[in-house]
Amino acid sequence: MASIFSRIIQGELPCEKIDETDNEICFLDISPFTEGHTLVIPKREVARFEELPKTEAFSLMQTMQRVAKAVCKAYGGSDYNIQLNNGPDAGQEVPHVHFHIIPRPDGLRVPKLGTYADGQMADVGARIRACLDS
């Protein structure tokens, strides 16, 4: 059975897409720790990071770097967390490798944001997309 992320990649489920390449898709986390919390996901469905072919792992890292810069620019900070929960014992809830980019402007230390208000995800997505490659 396809993971929820594969279903998003295939267009079966909606997301607030930030970016997409041949190998990756990036979209907002629906239960963010902070506003702008973005997931970077390989299109190949593998449960663990080490299962990705090296070329795809390298591509994933390049996309993470590009999106992290955009998230920082969108939120006026330079600090962020990159998080990977690699396996169920590490807290991985979806068995499809994915990285979290969590902005931390001004040293923000807050509990999980919760959920976005109606229409807020589109605004947040537009804010980050406007900062890609700028």
Describe these PLM feature segments.
Residues 1-134:
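HIT superfamily nucleotide-processing domains
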